[in-house]
Every structure is written in C-alpha cells, then in structure tokens.
C-alpha cells in the first residue's frame, strides 16, 4: 500500500544556511495538514542527498522523532520538487497509488485520534524529551481504505468541513 523511508542523513557541518543546494524539511516545517518553508531551513549539497528522498507529489511527510504532542502531524506534498528533501528524523511515506485524494485520505486517517493513539502506543522514548516512531511498527498499523470513488467523496467532505472551520 505504501513505502516508508527516512529523509536525508548528513552531518551538522555539511549543512549550510546560504540557501544553496537541497532544502531540508525538518519536524518544525510540518504542521497539521501542511508544510512550510522557513527562513532558518538548512540546505545541503546534492552529493549528500539520495535522489529517492527528493519530495514528490502525493508523498506524505511526518516527524519520526518528536515530542508526544507532535506525533501524527502529517502533510501531503502538493507538487514534484527537484531541490527539497526531508531530514533524517522525518518519514517520507510514498503511497503506491499515485492519486492526490488517496494521499490526502491517508494523511487524514493517520491524523485521526484513533491512529494518533495507536502511533503513541508504538513509540519508544529516545532521550529526555523525544519519542521515536519506528518505521517497521508504523507499517503494521491498519488503515481502513474504501474504494477510490468513496475516498474522493470523503476527502471533499473533510475539505469542506475544514474550510468552514478555518473561515470562522
């Protein structure tokens, strides 16, 4: 149904702030249902980034190492990039079905209270304040997927409700 991988791994001294090379998205770039570029984003030379970690349309990004409160933040990539990757503490979830509504539905399901609680249950404490969401354990979660036409209908309804909430 999907592939899960971590983003680019590099040493701190290989990162730069001169906005040259590949932009690296970290946990702070991921908000519920969206991602943002920030002024303090780090960049690394292309030689340190595996081509399969470059973000493509329909991929979902989520923090892999984070605080308990941030488990379940998901963002769907809206277009193909040639110079943006995720960092090593971020999961890149690539659905085998390349359909934007399918990716949105997966992200919405993964952000549901039920699945957030399930993800919290499979995390391991890593250091004083961080939790590590294991890739293999994440792959074992069950996702209820309806037929594609129903997925589109559900996504439309969720978007309509979210739009109504945001306009208040």
What are the residue ranges of the model-derived segments?
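Non-catalytic DNA-recognition/assembly elements of restriction-modification systems
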Residues: 1-9, 144-168
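A short beta-sheet element
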Residues: 26-27, 50-111, 134
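Short, solvent-exposed loop/turn and secondary-structure capping segments
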Residues: 36, 73-74, 121
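A short glycine-rich beta-alpha junction/loop motif
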Residues: 83-91, 125-145
């Amino acid at each position: 149904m999907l592939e899960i991988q971590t983003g680019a791994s590099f040493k701190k001294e290989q990162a730069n702030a001169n906005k040259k090379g590949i932009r690296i998205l970290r946990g702070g770039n991921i908000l519920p249902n969206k991602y943002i570029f920030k002024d303090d984003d780090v960049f690394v030379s292309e030689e340190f980034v595996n081509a399969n970690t470059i973000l493509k349309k329909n991929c979902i990004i989520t923090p892999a190492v984070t605080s308990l409160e941030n488990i379940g933040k998901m963002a769907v990539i809206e277009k193909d990039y040639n110079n943006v990757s995720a960092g090593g503490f971020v999961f890149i979830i690539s659905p085998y079905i390349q359909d934007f509504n399918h990716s949105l539905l997966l992200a919405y399901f993964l952000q549901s209270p039920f699945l957030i609680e399930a993800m919290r249950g499979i995390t391991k404490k890593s250091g004083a304040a961080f939790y590590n969401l294991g890739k293999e354990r994440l792959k074992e979660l069950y996702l209820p997927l309806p037929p594609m036409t129903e997925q589109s209908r559900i996504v439309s309804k969720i978007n309509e409700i979210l739009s109504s909430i945001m306009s208040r």
